[in-house]
């Protein structure tokens, strides 16, 4: 799994239909202070990756304390998460100018894992709002910092836990 995490003061998502207008079947989602995360899944990802990544995000100390040091977690500040499924995080651009997405998980698996991952985040007591899997979305956010961190379970998880 791969996540691009951005610390935000606010973020929102709308779904766009095939006509290029807002999809009336999707209720726009918005959050206040917290994280906007783009989540990519591979076919090799499973429960171990979900558990490790959710724990890492819930406990990541990237919010300032009273002294201005990044010393507080999203749980500490009572923040929220906006989670967006994003298969393009696994783009391969080695050949030519057109990205290949062969490393991205198959849609059925990726959707299931993304939902399960968001549930793991919620179990940590943090409200999680979501986009719609596979949809064309418009995501808006106000970066706070900016603080942007890429977490990749393939490279960042300790060897014994993969």
Swiss-Prot record:
Q: Where in the cell is it found?
A: Cytoplasm
For this chain, one GO molecular function annotation is: Gly-tRNA(Ala) deacylase activity
Disulfide bond sites: none
Supply the enzyme class, top level: hydrolase
Magnesium in keyword set = no
* Signal peptide (residue range): none
Q: Provide a GO CC annotation, any one.
A: cytoplasm
InterPro entries for this protein? Daa-tRNA_deacyls_DTD, DTD-like_sf
- Sequence motif Gly-cisPro motif, important for rejection of L-amino acids, location on chain: 145-146
Q: How does it assemble?
A: Homodimer.
Q: What is known of its domains?
A: A Gly-cisPro motif from one monomer fits into the active site of the other monomer to allow specific chiral rejection of L-amino acids.
Protein's job: An aminoacyl-tRNA editing enzyme that deacylates mischarged D-aminoacyl-tRNAs. Also deacylates mischarged glycyl-tRNA(Ala), protecting cells against glycine mischarging by AlaRS. Acts via tRNA-based rather than protein-based catalysis; rejects L-amino acids rather than detecting D-amino acids in the active site. By recycling D-aminoacyl-tRNA to D-amino acids and free tRNA molecules, this enzyme counteracts the toxicity associated with the formation of D-aminoacyl-tRNA entities in vivo and helps enforce protein L-homochirality.
What protein am I looking at? D-aminoacyl-tRNA deacylase
Q: Which organism is it from?
A: Bifidobacterium longum (strain DJO10A)
Gene (name only): dtd
